[in-house]
A protein has these predicted regions:
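A positional/structural detector of protein chain ends, strongest at the extreme C-terminus
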Residues: 1-4, 385-389
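A short helix->beta-strand "capping" segment at the edge of beta-propeller domains
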Residues: 4-42, 71, 304-312
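Repetitive beta-architecture junctions, highlighting loop-to-beta-strand starts
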Residues: 15, 62, 73, 96, ...
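WD40/WD-repeat beta-propeller blade N-cap
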Residues: 35-43, 78-85, 121-127, 162-169, ...
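Beta-strand-rich domains and repeat architectures in extracellular enzymes and scaffolds
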Residues: 37-62
Length: 389
């Protein structure tokens, strides 16, 4: 992200409307009065497919979309689950392989070239998070209190860890460079680091981190991805070393700190780690759809320090749910509760000048709608809550 900021900063390049409002009682007219409170399909999650071939979106209408990273054009769409899709995972090796988990108590593995799922794993509990590791052979799922493991090749359950958490497991993530190690994070405020090659839970537990508040988002950072950041439901940020279980810093008032420095912040979205500059950036948002990128101090000298890096506004009209940053093209993608997918790029680059390929995706058409007052589906106002969900 530092590279993009130094080359002129990130600006809105394109906007795609993922879904349009369904007509009610035969009314097919566009909604003109955008002050009304309409129900919109949220973009809940976004993940890049292998070889940067596209972007997979999980929508609140229980569908998955595949879109072009260059144009945001719609490539493929299918109905995935019978309840909320909580996460989507994409294979790092095959652009056609992805997995989804849902509150309908199952995980589905997909080959997007086929109409039906390649495999359905009946977990039997609401699945809040999933990750696949160990050479894409082991599926880890986060459910109520249990981390459950399955063989991706057969769908058979291999085991579970159920003693380390006392509340719902909100995130499971295999380590990016040590694929036999998995992190679990929970609403109980605890983050655990396991060697999942070991079936006994006590023996498998490498470290345990007490974040002290319900964990909503985690991610790895550092040259060897030896550290982890944790965002919580009370809008705090924790930085830890996974291997030593050392707390690097606890940002207890980071939302207030942003507001006190004229950075309007209602919630914390996610963090982006820049491998090239070894910097961690926090993306914080407000209910109007604006974002600020804040550089987070991670070493001893800079711990506790915050530095405003960029303001991103004009793309969204409601809370932002998910982000993906492509370091190769210095491009940021954001999805929100306004059913919009936005692309932010350095002005003048190839990524910023890519043309839209269908009627769903166009920066110019989006600007035209704002000018005329017409907005397809009348964007729903963000809920006035401390979290966007």
């Amino acid at each position: 992200m530092r590279g993009g900021l130094e080359r002129g900063g990130l600006a809105l390049a394109q906007t795609a409307v993922a879904t349009f409002a369904q007509p009610q009682q035969g009314d097919t007219s566009l909604v003109v009065n955008t002050t009304e409170d309409f129900d919109y399909d949220y973009i809940l999650d976004c993940q890049p497919t292998a070889h940067k071939s596209g972007l997979a979106l999980a929508l609140s209408n229980r569908k998955v979309q595949l879109r072009s990273l260059d144009t945001l054009g719609l490539v493929h769409e299918f109905h995935a689950h019978n309840s909320t899709i909580n996460e989507v995972w994409t294979s790092p090796s095959s652009p056609y392989q992805l997995a989804t988990c849902s509150s309908d108590e199952c995980v589905k593995l997909w080959d997007t070239r086929a109409a039906l799922p390649a495999m359905v794993v009946p977990v039997g509990r609401e699945v809040w998070s999933l990750s696949i590791g160990c050479g894409e052979t082991l599926l880890a799922t986060g459910t109520n209190e249990l981390a459950m493991f399955y063989d991706v090749r057969t769908g058979n359950k291999l085991g579970e860890y159920g003693e380390s958490h006392i509340d719902a497991i909100t995130k499971v993530r295999f380590h990016p460079t040590q694929p036999a190690f998995v992190v679990t994070a929970s609403e109980d405020g605890v983050v655990c680091f396991f060697d999942c090659r070991i079936p006994d839970e006590d023996d498998a537990l490498e470290s345990i981190l007490n974040v002290e508040s319900a964990v909503t988002t985690i991610g790895f950072f550092g040259p060897q991805k030896e550290n982890i950041f944790c965002l919580t439901g009370t809008e705090t940020l924790d930085l830890w070393n996974l291997w030593t279980a050392e707390r690097l810093h606890h940002y207890a008032t980071i939302r207030d700190d942003c507001n006190n420095n004229s950075l309007p912040t209602d919630y914390l979205i996610n963090c982006v780690y820049d491998d090239n500059s070894n910097e961690l950036f926090l993306l914080a948002g407000n209910h109007d759809g604006d974002m600020n990128a804040v550089n987070i101090g991670t070493d001893t000298a800079s711990a506790g320090k915050l530095q405003h890096a960029a303001t991103l506004k004009g793309g969204h009209k409601a809370a932002i749910r998910c982000i993906y940053y492509d370091p190769e093209t210095t491009t940021l993608y954001t999805g929100g509760e306004d059913t919009r997918l936005c692309k932010w790029a350095v002005p003048g680059t190839a990524s910023a000048s890519a043309e839209a390929s269908d009627g769903y995706s166009s920066a110019s058409s989006s600007n035209s709608r704002r000018t005329t007052g017409l907005d397809p589906a009348g964007i729903r106002k963000a809920r006035k809550a401390s979290r966007p969900y």
